[in-house]
Amino acid sequence: MSLFEKVFGTHSDKELKKIYPIVDKIEALDSTMQALSDEELKAKTPEFKERLEKGETLDDLLPEAFAVVREAADRVLHMKHYRVQLIGGILLHQGRIPEMRTGEGKTLVSTLPAYLNALEGKGVHIVTVNDYLAKRDAEWMGQVHEFLGLTVGVILNSDKNDARRAAYNCDITYVTNNELGFDYLRDNMVIYKEQLVQRDLHYAIVDEVDSVLIDEARTPLIISGQSGKSTDLYKMCDYLARRMKRGTASMEISKLDAIMGTEIEEDGDYLVDEKDKQVVLTAQGVKEVEQFFHIDNFSDADNIDIQHNMIMALRAHALMFRDKDYVVKDDEVLIVDEFTGRIMPGRRFSDGLHQAIEAKENVKVKRESRTLATITFQNFFNKYKKKAGMTGTALTEEEEFREIYGMDVVVVPTNLPVQRIDHHDSIFKTKKEKLNAIVQAVVEAHDKGQPVLVGTITIDASEELSRMLTKRGIQHKVLNAKFHELEAEIVADAGQRGAVTIATNMAGRGTDIKLGEGVAELGGLKIIGTERHESRRIDNQLRGRAGRQGDPGESKFYLSLDDDLMRLFGSEKVKAVYDALKIPEGEEIQHKTISKFVEKAQMKIESNNFAIRKNLMEYDQVNNDQREVIYAERRRVLDGENMRDVIFKFIQDTVESYIDKTCSADLAPSEWQIGELNQLLIPIIPMEPIELTEEEKKSGKLDKFKQRIKEEAAKVYEAKEAEFPEPEHFREIERVVLLKVIDKKWMAHLDDMTPVSYTHLTLPTILL
């Protein structure tokens, strides 16, 4: 906390002061609500709706509506909202992000603003990160809403359109972010209005909002179809990449060096920049590629596919690691989420990187997909009239939430004081020394019965630590992407006396570890982090597994100079501190200089990732502006608007365009390309072949000629229209054809735009 904040208070302090009087009003109504019968409490819902119709606002109703939900939750679930949960509910109603720690009951908090905003009858979406949570929360919290007379729906991945439509038409709908986004895209591909499933996007409450709007922000949702591209080039590039030698440069290559053409001594065939995750060919490497593919000039535009696929093949080998970035299961490459450690079925790296990894791992290389419709979560959630979110870790990304989504973060105090002790980091010179220290710490805690949760970043690290603990005779459980089926069982036991659990980031979110009998007296759950993540949020999530609802607990991170974060961001400075202190081998140091260095490195990476996400949004904004226009036009057609005048104008414009292509007022009529004009027009407008009249040959007036052809084209259209006894039948054909043409042209445009949009970033994409 800065000196300014100490003197004047934080942003959260100031905002909470404004909210406390509203909370007081809600609590003052407690005895009044308790005195109501069930029927009288239920009658409040139609009363509130009537008051809204008469001009009252949601803010006017808030204290009483929240008090009603509070009492209903007590009667139905035997759970009564604490004061801090009322604060969280008010912030959600205001379209903000309350940061509430693990175990503070965020799920119950959402019932307050969901009920209040559902009174408008326009739909409330409660967004979760997976089907399990959507179903659980709908069945659990939905009881409160149904008791009060509201309808509750849930949408699961397996649901058909009729079930989806019914769920979206409910007052409150529980749904995952992926299903929401894909339903939006599918709705903008339907041919008949009856096929639509969603209503307008009114109000969304996003659970784990930082996961959805920050971590997933770089992941475009894509509805795809198969492209006709061969996969042979990926295999050829992989063959060559295996034979190329990684080199080193004599100095770090900056953007300025590249622009100025600074000569840099280099060896090998390619260079790797681990910080920016980029690969570049050396002059020698370029020669190797030219010789292998028998091409004269690697940089020639005709060789763009070879250029691109060669870089992807090298990236697959130099920067993408099995059991860290992906796993191979059942002859398929599956992405591992860097933030959660979970396998992400159905997602593929974009830009050909996934195919390059498939070639590297010698599994079937799948064809690249063709984009039929796409949107990012950033642009999708910004379509809501109002949105809010909940999480235990949002403050570190406050600037991004405010700048991109227009939501501020307010830290909500805990219901009970936090008793967890967060120790300073311990730093070791080598990875081996660090792991030995971690194992010793686990053994000491285990000997006294204190449960331990060890958090690792990669699957490899979790398995290495598991082997070391096995050698020491320590019984333990491992939770990573390979053993995710046992997650619920493993997490349920992690707080029991003597339990030792090794987990990747999977255990960092959405899990509530309860302490077993007698564990509180032993110091509670002990959290050990085996290295710092690039994001401080992920570290905070791991810490947050301990110390829930006033429980005791402790956390500590163990680092080494071999860790990626330390190695890539100036470990020479840290080594200098280490050497100056003359630390014997195997001993740790705890030094504020190094702790500050680690935090600065994390902030630097977070800032860089924010810049990437912001850059993506700026790129996607071009697509988004165009998508808005296309989808709005599409909806006009779908809604049944009479398109006769629009199509009539299309015909007139087409005639004019083709005549301008083939005829000119500057040329004699005998030089007009009438044959070519017929070839262009007749396949589109089935009219008689065009011939110049004697008058047109003499006068050479192009405008009059245009007018005549336009009139003839109009007659063809009117004759076709007259063939239908019911004009509406013809209108329906027009609508269907027009929609199909719009879709075909839009998909072709997306094909053209894809290289512009995403080639500067290699992203996991969610494919359907």
Give the predicted meaning of each segment.
Residues 326-334, 340-347, 549-550, 557, ...:
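Extended, charged helical/alpha-beta scaffold domains that provide interaction surfaces
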